[in-house]
Amino acid sequence: MQRRSRGINTGLILLLSQIFHVGINNIPPVTLATLALNIWFFLNPQKPLYSSCLSVEKCYQQKDWQRLLLSPLHHADDWHLYFNMASMLWKGINLERRLGSRWFAYVITAFSVLTGVVYLLLQFAVAEFMDEPDFKRSCAVGFSGVLFALKVLNNHYCPGGFVNILGFPVPNRFACWVELVAIHLFSPGTSFAGHLAGILVGLMYTQGPLKKIMEACAGGFSSSVGYPGRQYYFNSSGSSGYQDYYPHGRPDHYEEAPRNYDTYTAGLSEEEQLERALQASLWDRGNTRNSPPPYGFHLSPEEMRRQRLHRFDSQ
């Protein structure tokens, strides 16, 4: 898959605009570092996409294990980067304030590797069960799997309520599954197994033994660690900020952190932005020839062969 080189990287510009509207000082450090790292890899890719994407054939059979680390940090194009990192921005703000920076960094690192491992297991199982070797050659790239895992965590910590997906109210606890199916139906170029892997990793953390295993391996710190003396708050009326917590006084004092989200999201929730992304994906695919799906991160064997031929022809 080859990134589009024509015109301006509108998605990247829009992402930077969102970051600066929120305010760099208002973004927790690990979330900000994750955004910066993904942007840096987009602007300075370490390898071409066909050399960094994740597949059973390349990673397991050919022992190219570095793809487990490279694939989440590479994106197909600027819009793929934008929608992933815009989602990471909001999930990171919520989860890092709740879990603490050190534990959140641990979660991001573990999820980045584990979603890749689960993806390989899913692809291998499907290839063996259906006797279809092409599944072992199917290659995936992007941060979406990690984001699905984080969405499971976010819904676990904020249960109840409904979200609007494609115009339909969906309970929070089912939102990940509905989004999984909706994205696959409306943007078939995306990796269903990659997104499913993220959901499964998230469930392993919230419902399974993964959290306890991570705590046992961490030793000196746990998910209960947070920002000392300061608590982030956000309520349904739209006000937000940082509230200092003092056990012996001044419990109601807070410092406002302005967050007028509507000025740069047009009043859209994350689910409504997803719907716009799916619609834009369909429009873009119908108006662009020989270009990768804008928000997917799936590389078929045919696409990989085409990219190799293109690389040799251009030399």
Swiss-Prot record:
Subcellular location field: Endoplasmic reticulum membrane; Mitochondrion membrane
Residues spanning the membrane: 22-42, 107-127, 139-157, 181-201
GO biological process: apoptotic process; cellular response to unfolded protein; cellular response to UV; ERAD pathway; membrane protein intracellular domain proteolysis; membrane protein proteolysis; membrane protein proteolysis involved in retrograde protein transport, ER to cytosol; negative regulation of apoptotic process
SUPFAM superfamilies: Rhomboid-like
Topological domains, Extracellular: 43-106, 158-180
Comp. bias regions, Basic and acidic residues: 300-315
A cellular component term, taken from the record's GO annotations: endoplasmic reticulum membrane
Induction, per UniProt: Up-regulated by endoplasmic reticulum stress agents that induce the unfolded protein response (UPR).
Catalytic activities: Cleaves type-1 transmembrane domains using a catalytic dyad composed of serine and histidine that are contributed by different transmembrane domains
Annotated segments matching region Ubiquitin-binding domain (UBD): 269-284
Membrane-topology descriptor: Multi-pass membrane protein
GO molecular function: endopeptidase activity; serine-type endopeptidase activity
Protein name: Rhomboid-related protein 4
Native organism: Homo sapiens (Human)
Organism lineage string: Eukaryota, Metazoa, Chordata, Craniata, Vertebrata
